[in-house]
């Protein structure tokens, strides 16, 4: 994967320079541990046939992403309070096997790449025993100034500090 070199500057913001293959923490994302978020399929998650509706997967991915960031010390309410939002700007989902009413599974998520203010998150939903894979996805977030609606030039320091813990 190609991405910009990240370097920590004195005010703990991230600046970008030339493009080279680098990963947060210096390791390939395949080596990074997954954050695990349990899901249970309730009636409101399903369509008329008892199969999980495609939008439920997206909602679960957002819940898992918020909890993943919280586990690193970043509370979304704090990001909002300082005027930052992390909207989804790209989403790719591959549904591999349907989840059905009453099933339980694990949604795994991890940071795969950072380029400037853009973060790419990998997700997958697997059976509790890990033998079945139901869905894989990639979500791209961008840091935005909530008031102006413009992409930020650098990540907020609280987010930078959390991402540095991945190294």
Name these PLM-found stretches:
Residues 4-33, 37, 100-104, 112-167:
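HotDog/MaoC-like acyl-thioester-processing domains
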Residues 11-71:
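Catalytic strand-loop segment that frames the active site of acyl-thioester-processing enzymes
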Residues 35, 50-51, 84-86, 132:
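Residues that recognize and position ribonucleotide moieties
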Residues 68-119, 135, 142:
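Hydrophobic beta-strand-centered segment that forms part of the acyl-chain substrate-binding groove
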Residues 39-43, 95, 143:
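Hydrophobic residues in beta-strands and at strand termini
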